[in-house]
Swiss-Prot record:
The gene is RBCS1. This is Ribulose bisphosphate carboxylase small subunit, chloroplastic 1. Pfam families: RbcS (PF12338), RuBisCO_small (PF00101). RuBisCO catalyzes two reactions: the carboxylation of D-ribulose 1,5-bisphosphate, the primary event in carbon dioxide fixation, as well as the oxidative fragmentation of the pentose substrate. Both reactions occur simultaneously and in competition at the same active site. Although the small subunit is not catalytic it is essential for maximal activity. It comes from Solanum tuberosum. GO terms for molecular function: ribulose-bisphosphate carboxylase activity. InterPro entries: RuBisCO_ssu, RuBisCO_ssu_dom, RuBisCO_ssu_N, RuBisCO_ssu_sf. Heterohexadecamer of 8 large and 8 small subunits.
């Protein structure tokens, strides 16, 4: 057993010496030699040197003007009634308790009373009625959303899925935004 350990260590040191002097070829970019060149340009632009031969696709950042961020997926378009129903059914299928909240002034996080990092005002909204313990039908939740819309047409309304076993909020999404937002 000891001889096998010694021999494997000896083999490993030999391969490490050989690997230390070798340089692996770079395979990330396509070789410029494979593309036909018709004219040699002496004024080479530095940005054209590193190219993978394809189109550059950049992700657009969140526009900060007139686009408030409400929840995690707030960059998506507003959910239709069918999509809301599917989200609520997903919430119910996981055994979470649906709960509605609304906010009449600020439907987004903001800083007003404190400038500490990580502290935001507007995180806590007013609960609409009581949590819907025992709810098994997504249309009941959407009926409550409609009732909240009728009572507060200028308010933001969100649906929360609460796990009463772990005592945590598992899902939260905007169900209604006032006109102009």
């Amino acid at each position: 057993m000891a001889s096998s350990i010694v021999s494997s260590a000896a083999v490993a040191t030999r391969s490490n010496v050989a690997q230390a002097s070798m340089v692996a070829p770079f395979t990330g970019l396509k070789s410029a030699a494979s593309f036909p060149v018709t004219k040699k340009n002496n004024n080479v632009d530095i940005t054209s040197l590193a190219s993978n031969g394809g189109r550059v696709r950049c992700m657009q950042v969140w526009p900060p003007i007139n686009m408030k961020k409400y929840e995690t997926l707030s960059y998506l378009p507003d959910l239709s009634d069918e999509q809301l129903l599917k989200e609520v059914e997903y919430l119910l299928k996981n055994g979470w308790v649906p709960c509605l909240e609304f906010e009449t002034e600020h439907g987004f996080v903001y800083r007003e009373h404190n400038s500490s990092p990580g502290y935001y005002d507007g995180r806590y909204w007013t609960m609409w009625k009581l949590p819907m313990f025992g709810c098994t039908d997504g249309t009941q939740v959407l009926a409550e959303v409609q009732e909240a819309k009728n009572a507060y047409p200028q308010a933001w309304i969100r649906i929360i899925g609460f796990d009463n076993v772990r005592q945590v909020q598992c899902i939260s999404f905007i169900a209604y935004k006032p006109e102009g937002y």
